[in-house]
Amino acid sequence: MATPPARSASPPPPVSGRKTSRRRALTPLSPPPSPLRPIFFSRAEIAAVYDTPLLDLAFAAARVHRAHHDPAMVQRCTLLSIKTGGCPEDCGYCSQSSHHKKVDLEAERLADLDSVFEAALRAKAAGSTRFCMGAAWRGPSQVGPRQWERVLEMVRRVRGLGMEVCTTLGMLTPEQAAQLREAGLTAYNHNVDTSPEYYSKVSTTRTYADRLATLAAVQGAGVSVCAGGIIGLGEGPGDRVGLLHTLATLPAHPESVPINALVAVPGTPMEGNPPPTGLDIVRCVATARVVMPASVVRLSAGRKELSPGDQALAFLAGANSVFDGDKLLTTANADRDDDAALFGALGLKSRPAFLPYGAGGETSRTGAVEGGAVKEQRA
């Protein structure tokens, strides 16, 4: 079957109530999309891809992956919480929300510069090439100018180490996004979590439109977007399709797409949710790879619970980034020694910092820091 035809540069409107049972699913014989331009899929087309038998889907996604990426190269990222707990949002999965009184977590103040710099040094020495910093707040607008300047200085210092820098700080204004870019930020993470239809069951203190407004501010500043979602929130397959449709029809495909498996933290409203299976994650990875062929697809939270076989299939189907280190914000992560053994068994190698990315903004085409100044390298 031929690949669905290329769409215009403007994403199509969401498809609602449209029957897809008669649509032919993607097959392993489908040629991979051209690496020269993005293809926008309708929601019904993404549903047809998602519903393809898993082995056929993984095979087709692997062909797309190899057309756009070195299949043996995997990016290694480290994520650090620079401000833990006390968040005013009520996201049902999050241990850092101040609404969830039963969670055993003590709120902390914004970290100092030296401790963050030392953590980045350790991450670089361990082989990470991207350092991500997360703060549990609604957004920088809720903190004072001195704290905001401290965050900007964190970005500058980590960037000065020759590492890619990502932050996840909640909702941004266009002015804040521009300041982060000026400080040397590589990418900004702001997950949309799930589909527009299911989002009200995840959070009531902000809207899906709030999420999209931050992504628009980030893209408007020329900063690369890192945006993904969480599998296991109680959503159905249609919501997973809706999540991927939202991401795949942004004005530009995200530079990075994190696929998280819910880590059910005791004391949160979602503590009793059953975890997604490894094959659920593989299906989402493979679909993301087909519909966003040039984006980096990251195995993120919950990877510790995936078997080596699940991870191997995910890498085959298009995953090409992981978080390493023993912790992701407040939850446990896969062991670095286990990762080294898995990479060795699969013949994987680490992606160097500052290779140009196939998707994302200008900040993903920026070279290494030389003498404190940023040197631009166009793809």
Kindly give the residue locations of the regions a language model identified.
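Functionally engaged cysteine thiol sites
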Residues: A2, C87, C91, C132, ...
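Conserved Radical SAM active-site core
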Residues: S98-G228, L233-T249
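Auxiliary Fe-S-binding modules of radical SAM enzymes
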Residues: A2-S10, R18-M73, A248-A379
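Glycine- and other small-residue-rich loops at beta-strand/loop junctions that grip anionic moieties
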Residues: L80, L169, T207, G229-G232, ...
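Hydrophobic faces of well-ordered beta-strands that scaffold small-molecule active sites
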Residues: V74-L79, F131-M133, V165-T167, Y188-H190, ...
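Glycine-/proline-rich flexible loop or hinge segments
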Residues: A44, V74-T78, S97-L105
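Local cysteine-cluster metal-coordination motifs and their immediate loop/turn environment
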Residues: L80-S98
